[in-house]
């Protein structure tokens, strides 16, 4: 089964333990923002390398070595149809999406992950304290109306935002009233810290006591209200990532199902990358020999009995593709 197809040029083996050390020579700080997905991954990938004039595609298998790694909560799940990217603004620089099949079985895995970090008792206590203080049962609120996908994303203007999709946003809005303060008609803030982390884990660790808005069966949150106002403006005006040529081009070349999906838009993240990468490397990345012609980077992981089926796509810019095809 390891035979390469005719277009494959090579077999690539990536030890993600050595990757952060390698990238620290290039990156001016700890891997964060769009590169944080490569931090602490403790994984090994075996990938077939497929190169054409419009893309580099790597396909194969990733094994996450550390059983306490957050990614392993997804390694034996069924791949899900990813749709939460439909609400992302056009100026999204990068995103990471996580998709599960069913919350309650997954929550057991999350509890084990918390226990391995020695955070389970603290989290249980937090929920009990909130339940007592507000005379409610948090387990009947977020878990009940969470559908199956969560996302964190960063805008070209550096703001970081998180979101989950919902089965009934109106109902959740009502149930969160006692736990919330009104900032304005659309934007609220959570009164208690740590709720999102308790129910979803690592992606929402930095959204401790966020502002949030619920719109069209999405709960969207950020650490300041102005970020959500900017999000709502993009969303209501249909200025969306899924309408951009670069995103359309990349998504057309990949399966729509995954459990973890990571995306970087080259143009939208150029300013963020410049702040994070030493200047000589940045100049090379932006050169013709570097990544200048490429529009996006996508990294998809789909659960497969404890390991991940993997797709990595580095896709050429859509306008360059059009020029190339006109020249044919």
Predicted features, each with a name:
Residues 1-2, 96, 142-250:
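Single conserved position on a long alpha-helix in the C-terminal lobe of the eukaryotic protein kinase
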Residues 1-110, 248-328:
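Leucine-rich, highly hydrophobic segment in Treponema pallidum outer-membrane-associated proteins
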Residues 118-125, 129, 133, 170, ...:
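Alpha-helix boundary/N-cap detector
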Residues 14-15, 19, 123-140, 268:
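Extended amphipathic, helix-rich lipid-handling scaffolds
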Residues 7, 81-84, 103, 117-121, ...:
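Short secondary-structure junctions and interdomain/linker hinges
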Residues 78-100, 131-155:
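Short, charged N-terminal helix-start/capping segments
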Residues 23-27, 32, 134, 140-144, ...:
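Intrinsic, low-complexity N-terminal interaction/targeting segments
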């Amino acid at each position: 089964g390891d035979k390469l197809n005719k277009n494959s040029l090579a077999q690539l083996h990536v030890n993600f333990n050595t990757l952060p050390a390698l990238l620290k020579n290039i990156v001016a700080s700890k891997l964060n923002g769009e590169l944080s997905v490569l931090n602490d991954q403790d994984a090994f990938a075996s990938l077939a390398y497929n190169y054409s004039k419009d893309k580099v595609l790597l396909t194969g298998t990733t094994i996450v070595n550390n059983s306490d790694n957050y990614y392993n909560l997804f390694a034996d799940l069924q791949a899900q149809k990813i749709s939460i990217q439909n609400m992302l603004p056009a100026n999204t620089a990068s995103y990471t999406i996580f998709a599960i099949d069913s919350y309650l079985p997954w929550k057991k895995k999350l509890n084990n992950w918390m226990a391995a970090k020695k955070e389970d008792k603290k989290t249980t206590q937090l929920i009990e304290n909130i339940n007592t203080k507000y005379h409610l049962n948090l387990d009947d609120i977020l878990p009940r109306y969470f559908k199956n996908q969560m996302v964190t994303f960063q805008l070209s203007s550096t703001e970081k935002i998180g979101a989950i999709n919902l089965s009934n946003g109106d109902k959740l809005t009502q149930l969160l009233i006692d736990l919330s303060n009104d900032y304005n008609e659309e934007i609220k803030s959570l009164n208690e810290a740590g709720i999102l982390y308790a129910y979803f884990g690592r992606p929402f660790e930095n959204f401790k006591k966020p502002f949030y808005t619920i719109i069209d069966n999405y709960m969207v949150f950020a650490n300041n209200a102005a970020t959500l106002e900017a999000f709502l403006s993009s969303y209501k005006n249909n200025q969306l990532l899924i309408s951009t040529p670069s995103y359309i081009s990349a998504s057309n070349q990949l399966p729509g199902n995954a459990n973890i999906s990571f995306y970087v838009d080259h143009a939208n993240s150029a300013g963020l990358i410049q702040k994070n990468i030493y200047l000589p490397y940045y100049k090379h990345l932006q050169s013709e020999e570097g990544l200048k012609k490429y529009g996006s980077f996508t990294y998809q992981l789909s659960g497969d009995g404890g390991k991940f089926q993997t797709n990595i796509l580095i896709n050429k810019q859509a306008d360059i593709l059009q020029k190339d095809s006109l020249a044919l």
